């Protein structure tokens, strides 16, 4: 993740703060906690995968594998936590939207019982738009990787 560990201002981000920073909820919240947060630079998200995940009912019966697109979504949610915290975005009236994904690669399957470590770093940031590179690992094996972009959008107050 780079040599910026000494600049980290917060080691761990718990689920309560994640819920305050991004709008995703069960069954679509795919980040359990985060660590190694470096403002405007990088973050590591953690997802503990269990057999109780709703997608395992159909993907695939008898051979459960986490869908690759959901691994990319988990990377994007981790990036959204980094953006929200770095920009001090108040989630009231604002939403971070996924804009694009490039160079997605799926290397190894993620199965029930795995812990995904999602290493996300900022490649570029301009105003409210961030471009990221993310790598999802289980142990020392890369499960998926991609570059993706997101932006903060004014959505108005909640109804």
From Swiss-Prot:
- List locations, semicolon-separated: Cytoplasm
Is Lipid biosynthesis set as a keyword in this record?
yes
GO molecular-function term, one example from the UniProt record: (3R)-hydroxyacyl-[acyl-carrier-protein] dehydratase activity
The answer, when asked if Lipid biosynthesis is one of the entry's keywords, is yes
GO cellular component, as recorded: cytoplasm; membrane
Under the heading CDD domains, the entry gives: FabZ (cd01288)
Which keywords has UniProt assigned to this entry? Cytoplasm, Lipid A biosynthesis, Lipid biosynthesis, Lipid metabolism, Lyase
Return any one Pfam family short name.
FabA
Q: What is its main location?
A: cytoplasm
**Its EC number(s):** 4.2.1.59
Q: Which reaction does it catalyse?
A: a (3R)-hydroxyacyl-[ACP] = a (2E)-enoyl-[ACP] + H2O
- Any idea which residues are catalytic in this one? 59
Disulfide bond residue pairs: none
SUPFAM superfamilies in the record: Thioesterase/thiol ester dehydrase-isomerase
Q: Name one GO biological process term.
A: lipid A biosynthetic process
- Protein family: Belongs to the thioester dehydratase family. FabZ subfamily.
- What does the function comment of this entry state? Involved in unsaturated fatty acids biosynthesis. Catalyzes the dehydration of short chain beta-hydroxyacyl-ACPs and long chain saturated and unsaturated beta-hydroxyacyl-ACPs.
Name of protein: 3-hydroxyacyl-[acyl-carrier-protein] dehydratase FabZ
Q: Which gene produces this protein? A: fabZ
